[in-house]
Amino acid sequence: MTSEQIRQTWLNFFKDKGHIIEPSASLIPVDDPTLLWINAGVAPLKKYFDGTETPKSKRITNIQKSIRTNDIDNVGKTARHHTFFEMMGNFSIGDYFKKEAIEFGFELLTSPKYFDIPLDKLYMTYYPTDVEAKNTWLKLGVKEDHLIPVEGNFWEIGAGPSGPDTEIFFDRGTSYDLRGPELIRDDIENERFIEIWNIVFSQYNADPKLKRSEYKELPNKNIDTGAGLERFACVLQGTKTNFETDLHYPVILKVESLSGVKYDGQMAFKVISDHIKTLVFAISDGANLSNEGRGYVLRRILRRAVKYGKSIGFDAPFLHLLVDTVVDMMSNFYTNLIETAVIVKKIILKEEEKFFSTILDGEKHLLQSIKDGKLSGEDAFKLYDTYGFPIELTIEYAEEHGITVDIKGFNEALEVQKSRSRDARKVTHSMKGQDEALLNFDVPSEFVGYDYLQTESKVIKVFDQGIVLDKTPFYANSGGQISDTGSINGLVVRDVIKLPHGQHLHLIETDAFTEGDEVLCIVNQDKRHHTMKNHTATHLLNQALKDTLGSHVKQQGSYNGDLKLTFDINHYETIKDEEILTVEKIVQQKIKEQIDVVTHVLPIDEAKKLGAAMQFGEKYGDIVRVVDVGSWSMEFCGGTHVKNTSDIKNFMITSVESIGSGTYRFEAITGQVLSQVKKIVQNLLDMIHQHIEKIKSLDENHNLKPLPELTGSYQDIINLRLYNQYISNESKVVEKQLEAKLIDQIILQADTFIPKTIEPTTYIYSDNLPQSSLKPLIDVLYDKIKADTVVLLNISEDKASYLVKSSVNEARNVINELNKVLDGRGGGKPDFAQGGTQALDKVQMFLKGKN
């Protein structure tokens, strides 16, 4: 059975059992700071399990692309570890539970209509006190000796939904290991029993303060399952490891062809096959390679693959040559890979070239830095910072040469270098506790805010936090757009949020309301209209970025408020000022063209046929809302928009910044932008005026270029940035000119420093002279005095400086003596040396001794 057949068999089976098919989410999590990557099938569905949102069906099935890197060192060493994998799942949110979930699993695995796995090849584990799970398996015909109680069969991560689980193992026979089911019971690493499916019965609300036996039952019991496609393929295709299945072997054959090395189970082939899939899928979803967060993870993966490639003869970039093989192998199911293939190859090749250019020097430095069988933390950090070696790669190299690495020292060096600090987000998938009252409230409420900003409504529910109305004109915070504010019966509506079943909860003083009250709702019109301008402008910006930077650009997040908009995108190169200006001009042109903004409500399949773009991280029902700007920009969107692009008035990009891992944030304003610009650039103007005041205080006649006028374009930001550089340089020029004049004046007065008595070693004292004048002064004094050695000691408010010039090679000796006496530091050559000290009390004692 091919992997494609396995996928379709899984999805069709659960579809026939009343499940809706949820498309795979992006590998990049949306609004979830606990995750670096989507790492399980349940991860994108957490909001359904904790009750934050209600799904359109209580039965869901999916095949979710996932990345986990905690076991990266095992990739290639074992038969089944991967960084990229596909997790097949079926989920019940408050619908069927334990008995049905087990029955579904049994039927799918053993029925000749589906996977047709012999029952005697399967072993099941269960939580020791979960009698219901055990008895359900027994009733289905599983033998007692194929059921194994395991204390660890309880899924729990912190507070929130938790419960027992049952795991299903496939027995590959004694040719893999003579030992039997004790391998499962005692959790011994082995190649005989392969875990293919885990079914979690989420029935308790975990509380760290309570014993497990005291956990309360969840108001909605859930089923969460995960089955690795790669493991299923290994079992059903009868291969020795996952890497000989059709999910990896085409890549291995391509590596054979490129390297000229025959595959015979070598770890290098497996690592390369796994890692290139991770890179292709992650970059296709908008991730980039960098030195922080998920970008650092990808860079480490690429460089690890290159390192193993070198071990089979690759001495030039090769990973980019494998991209087409991955696309051919996977694009039947993941069609977006075809669209992104070209840009993925470019990004991988660019990173490979960068690494290959430093890798030889890095390896040489590593071997040269080894002392007494150990690599210091400082050298390990240099390999990371200068040569681009991830510490994990350095450790692998070191282990191959029998060397230890000072990890503690490396971490200390990394901490010091603040600019390289990486995001230390913990990768978990903990869930919030369920709110029973909100979960159970399913009375419908209508949003009428597309057409009305004032309505008479009825209160249908009062919660502690706020009230729900039968109909409301107030937009709730969603889709990147802030909520409306305004009033209900004269009381201020602070915020509006969506409840699990989609109703709008108005955050307001609730004591004034009871259920059944008739109320008057008034939305703040100014705020709504400004928000609408910004939201429509965001759609224009999105399309302008694709037109300018390339079709690979994907939205990574957005904020549409009344005062500004922000828009996050992925891009693999630094965005140039000229590109930003081009994007801005495109949006401004679309505003001038006075294009009607039309909203369509239609079936999702029709919307897709029209080419409408889905918004980042959003889930859609069967009927969707599409916002169409003259067929130039067409997006799925539930937000509020202007009727015509001319309503936006104007558009200005105010900043573009990198926010890490190849992600850029655009910030912009709309409306009467010229009146807002000065406030936005005030910090830059303040810096410029400080420089101007400084220059005028030093030289009031110094000519300066005029300050550029503000025009209401990103060009203002560029002009002021350049002017700030110019004025900063002018300030330094004026300072140097004045300093040169001051030194000239000091030199003209050199005779006033000469003491009456000239000795072989003559000491000269001065107060508060500029540091830059001391060397020219001692040169002049030395020529005038003709002593063997001249010492110039200058005392300022917080330190003393001393310079020594000698024709008898005594300068270094004198400096060393002064350093001892004055508790100072310094050095130099026999004919000239200098030093300094902050111990002014010792300087005063020294002067008294000289007098």
From Swiss-Prot:
Q: What is its EC number?
A: 6.1.1.7
Cofactor: binding comment: Binds 1 zinc ion per subunit.
Membrane-crossing segments per the record: none
- Could you state one GO biological process linked to this protein? alanyl-tRNA aminoacylation
Give, as one word, the top-level EC class: ligase
Q: Which residues form a coiled coil?
A: none
Q: Which cofactor does it need?
A: Zn(2+)
Annotated binding of Zn(2+), by residue: H535, H539, C637, H641
List GO terms (cellular component aspect): cytosol
Chief subcellular site? Answer: cytoplasm
Alphabetized, the UniProt keywords read:
Aminoacyl-tRNA synthetase, ATP-binding, Cytoplasm, Ligase, Metal-binding, Nucleotide-binding, Protein biosynthesis, RNA-binding, tRNA-binding, Zinc
User: Where is this chain's protein located in or outside the cell?
Assistant: Cytoplasm
Describe the reaction catalysed, as an equation: tRNA(Ala) + L-alanine + ATP = L-alanyl-tRNA(Ala) + AMP + diphosphate
User: What Gene Ontology terms describe what this protein does at the molecular function level?
Assistant: alanine-tRNA ligase activity; aminoacyl-tRNA deacylase activity; ATP binding; tRNA binding; zinc ion binding
InterPro entries in UniProt:
aa-tRNA-synth_II/BPL/LPL, Ala-tRNA-lgiase_IIc, Ala-tRNA-ligase_IIc_anticod-bd, Ala-tRNA-synth_IIc_core, Ala-tRNA-synth_IIc_N, Ala-tRNA_ligase, Ala_tRNA_ligase_euk/bac, DHHA1_dom
UniProt keyword annotation of Metal-binding present: yes
UniProt free text on domains: Consists of three domains; the N-terminal catalytic domain, the editing domain and the C-terminal C-Ala domain. The editing domain removes incorrectly charged amino acids, while the C-Ala domain, along with tRNA(Ala), serves as a bridge to cooperatively bring together the editing and aminoacylation centers thus stimulating deacylation of misacylated tRNAs.
- Identify its protein family: Belongs to the class-II aminoacyl-tRNA synthetase family.
Q: Which PANTHER family match?
A: ALANINE--TRNA LIGASE, CYTOPLASMIC, ALANYL-TRNA SYNTHETASE
Q: What does this protein do?
A: Catalyzes the attachment of alanine to tRNA(Ala) in a two-step reaction: alanine is first activated by ATP to form Ala-AMP and then transferred to the acceptor end of tRNA(Ala). Also edits incorrectly charged Ser-tRNA(Ala) and Gly-tRNA(Ala) via its editing domain.
From the Swiss-Prot or TrEMBL record, give the protein name: Alanine--tRNA ligase
